[in-house]
UniProtKB/Swiss-Prot annotation:
This is Nucleotide-binding protein Deide_09390. GTP binds at residues 57-60. GO terms for molecular function: ATP binding; GTP binding. Displays ATPase and GTPase activities. It comes from the Bacteria. Keywords: ATP-binding, GTP-binding, Nucleotide-binding. Belongs to the RapZ-like family. Pfam families: PapZ_C (PF22740), RapZ-like_N (PF03668). Disulfide bonds: none annotated. The lineage of its organism: Bacteria, Thermotogati, Deinococcota, Deinococci, Deinococcales.
Length: 280
């Protein structure tokens, strides 16, 4: 069972690293003192957890006294034990703290806190398998580094959802797209009672080059957005496509996207507001 200990300087990105591991399927616990690592390991085994990550830092004031013993005991029980230590230069840490207006856990002046924290955490840095300097890394870059570090693989599913704006956009979508600029079959008496799943309706929606160009740009944007989500460790990504009523244009676009983006593992195409309530 992979057991990852994440530590490092306050403001260096521990929360970002822990969230990346959580998105990749790890059970995470924040600010767990070393003397509880063994108990956490036992509980995880008992509950059948397959991946566990914990973080620890200088807020656990007496953690150094238990560090060596806790680490040695755990390493004897679990071969797949990893320790990740994050750091950054003091100037960057200061900027991050000033931006978030947070207080340092040691509670002194920031530059003094950084120096003291480096000293306190030096033993943990010494036993780390990997040290990452996050000075020049964005949160996304760090998350990608963490996932690559542990060679994490995960199933990714793209969910496509068509809807009508007059029924309100879905609240759980990661990306909401408006396709109301496409030709509207509602104004054709023959096509009005039909749906975007039917070939004649789709042909009407994409009847001119402007519509084809619009779709091509939208498709490429959805692909880029979904791939970015996948590469940063997300397990799923929901794209909602909206027209006025959710009967014609959004359905046609969602269905076409499902066919064109098959390689992204389209999990389900849900036509929320289509009269028949059809699901593909």
């Amino acid at each position: 069972m992979p057991f990852v200990v994440v530590s490092g300087l306050s403001g260096s990105g521990k929360s970002t690293a822990l969230r990346a591991l959580e998105d990749a399927g790890f059970f995470i616990t924040d600010n767990l003192p070393p003397e509880l690592w063994g108990a956490m390991y036992d509980l995880s085994k008992a509950r059948g957890l397959t991946r566990v990550a914990v973080s620890t830092d200088a807020r656990t004031r007496d953690f150094l006294s238990a560090l060596d013993d806790s680490y040695i005991r755990l390493s004897r029980r679990e071969e797949d034990l990893h320790t990740l230590y994050l750091e950054a230069n003091s100037e960057v840490l200061l900027k991050r703290y000033n931006f978030t207006r947070r207080e340092h856990p040691l509670g002194e002046t920031l530059m003094v806190d950084f120096a003291r924290e480096r000293e306190l955490l030096a033993p943990l840095r010494a036993i780390a398998d990997t040290v990452i300097d996050t000075t020049d890394l964005s949160a996304t870059d760090l998350a990608e580094r963490v996932l690559r570090l542990f060679r994490l693989e995960h199933d990714f599913h793209l969910r496509l959802l068509s809807f009508g704006f007059k029924h309100a956009p879905p609240r759980d979508a990661d990306l909401v797209l408006d396709v109301r600029s496409l030709p509207n079959p509602h104004y054709d008496p023959v096509l009005r009672p039909r749906t975007g799943l039917e070939r004649e309706v789709a042909q009407y929606v994409f009847q001119n080059q402007a519509g084809e160009d619009f779709y091509a740009n939208l498709r490429d944007f959805v692909r880029t957005s979904a791939e970015r989500a996948r590469d940063t460790g997300r397990h799923g990504y929901t794209v909602a496509i909206g027209c006025t009523g959710g009967q014609h244009r959004s359905v046609a676009v969602a269905s076409r996207l499902a066919a064109d983006l098959r390689d992204l593992n389209v999990d389900i195409t849900d036509h929320r507001d289509m009269k028949a309530g059809t699901r593909e």
